[in-house]
């Protein structure tokens, strides 16, 4: 998953 896309 994307860490800098986690709200």
UniProtKB/Swiss-Prot annotation:
One of its GO terms (cellular component) is extracellular region. Disulfide bonds: none annotated. The modification Pyrrolidone carboxylic acid is found at residue 1. Expressed by the skin dorsal glands. Signal peptide: none annotated. The modification Arginine amide is found at residue 7. This is Tryptophyllin-5.1. It comes from Litoria rubella.
